[in-house]
């Protein structure tokens, strides 16, 4: 048996290379509202990447089927998939004022353990400045059902990341390289 062949997990997806990373908290876990600190990234997927979007839809459906008992909870029946929270969201309707999300869907993925981060040649990336909100890359993500404090749905876990290429940094902050790209001395006292 080939050791490199892994059993197929229908809830796991590897996104396409045109996926853009936003809100990339992949080096240090962050706590939201006093919750468990987590590593996270918003994965912006072009609507034209139908291959990735089809895989995500199938993985969400697989997570729904696998998690029916959890989703049912104390109720008598499982709520329909259309009635629960799912992680694939439309950037045009949910983030209409953010041009980075225009013409895209997005998925927020998180994990309590750090994701592995590699470059296009699968070498580990250790320099933090190489991974920022705005880069393009593939993401290994897994979908799962949850039922917590009355909230039921499908969530997305973050496994690993592969940076494919640089992109315009998101967040409106210029890089130090861009700020100091000119040799001119702009003396504000002149």
List the model feature ranges, each with a label.
Residues 69-150:
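Structured, beta-strand-rich domain cores
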Residues 1-106:
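OB-fold ssDNA-binding interfaces and closely related basic DNA-contact patches used
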Residues 118, 122-190:
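Compact mixed alphabeta submodule
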Residues 42-44, 108-110, 162-164:
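Residues in well-ordered beta-strands of folded domains
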